[in-house]
A protein has these predicted regions:
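Extended active-site neighborhood of metal-dependent phosphoesterases/phosphodiesterases
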Residues: 1-96, 184
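Short, electropositive alpha-helical surface patch
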Residues: 2, 25-44, 129-137, 164-176
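His/acidic metal-ligating clusters that form di-metal
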Residues: 9-10, 69, 75-77, 85-168, ...
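Catalytic metal-binding/acid-base residues of hydrolase active sites
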Residues: 17-20, 82, 119, 155-159, ...
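Acidic/histidine-rich helix-loop elements
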Residues: 29-32, 55, 85-90, 124-127, ...
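Active-site-proximal loop/helix segment associated with metal-binding centers of metalloenzymes
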Residues: 37-48, 95, 104-106, 110-123, ...
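Short, surface-exposed coil-to-beta transition loops
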Residues: 178-182
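A short C-terminal boundary segment appended to hydrolase-like catalytic domains
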Residues: 189-286
């Protein structure tokens, strides 16, 4: 993280759902898995103090949420919903602080970009519990009231974009998956343009893609034959990389999956809802 920060911009963090209060926290030595003490919210703030918290414009007293003023005219609002293990919920006491920060930014004539780990919008029709912030409706009302145009999230490990009215949410793909993407966000006074691109060499990208497809193929073989598993692997690769414009609907293989495994075909159909879409690019207006 310090090396990344040395490239010329700040590195800013927010806890994810695996970072705090974990009963299964462990370290690894060779093949051994050794239980260790988990990280608390206070530990997280101390460990990552140089990565946002030390220079926070404002910090919430009830969570690890904070505001970072990136430059004149732009603030980044980090909303924490993981201070309680597995909660996926913003503490109710945090909402007055969020509104006060949005009101202050509005009064100063400054734009706000929001960030969360779990998503504010539902990006897949099958997956809500554990993926979407449980009290997101209250947060969305504030974002609409104070004209927050975009939220950057993660958690799902897919590259995806969802828009509801004037609000856009970009789920940024995980570096550990498939194309190993990073997102580039270019801002103007009127809005922003987002592009996902691989952060690794073409050789490593090909290796990561092959590894991902092999795992997806193995999972598919648990319920189908090689042709069915290959189709599932292709769809998963397209979905996680955000390139559903490269996927296709195969009626014959869908029929075979429907006969073999109701859960898998339901999952496949949820992916195909985004058929034809390229989620590696997005734009929004302030």
């Amino acid at each position: 993280m310090r090396r990344a920060g040395g490239e010329g911009g700040p590195v800013l963090v927010l806890p994810g759902n695996h970072d705090l209060n974990r009963s299964d926290a462990a370290r690894f030595e060779g093949d051994a898995v050794i239980p260790v003490e988990s990280v608390s919210a206070a530990d997280f703030r101390r460990i990552y103090a140089p990565f946002g918290y030390d220079e926070a414009w404002s910090a919430d007293d009830h969570s690890l949420s904070y505001v970072y003023r990136l430059c004149d005219g732009l603030r980044i609002l980090f909303v924490d919903c993981n201070s309680d293990a597995g909660s996926d919920t913003i503490p109710s006491e945090t909402f007055p602080w969020i509104e006060s920060q949005l009101l202050e930014a509005q009064a100063a004539g400054e734009r706000v970009i929001a960030v969360s780990h779990q998503t504010v919008l539902q990006h897949n029709s099958r997956f809500a519990d554990g993926f979407v912030i449980t009290n997101r409706d209250r947060l969305l009302r504030l974002y609409r009231q104070y004209h927050v145009a975009v939220n950057l999230s993660g958690h799902m490990h897919i590259q995806h974009v969802r828009q509801e009215g004037s609000f856009t949410e970009i789920v940024t793909g995980a570096l550990s998956v498939l194309d190993c993407p990073c997102g580039v966000l270019r801002l103007t006074g009127e809005g922003g343009e987002y592009t996902a691109r691989s952060a690794v060499s073409a050789e490593l990208q090909a290796e990561a893609t092959a590894f991902f497809r092999a795992n997806a193929f193995h999972q598919g073989m648990a319920g189908g034959d090689e042709e069915m598993a290959g189709y599932l692997a292709d769809l998963n690769a397209a979905y996680f990389s955000g390139r559903m414009d490269l996927a296709e609907r195969n009626a014959a293989l869908l029929r075979r999956w429907r006969e073999a495994d109701a859960f898998t075909v339901s999952y496949i159909e949820s992916l195909l809802e985004d058929l034809g879409r390229d989620f590696t690019k997005a734009s929004f207006s302030f």
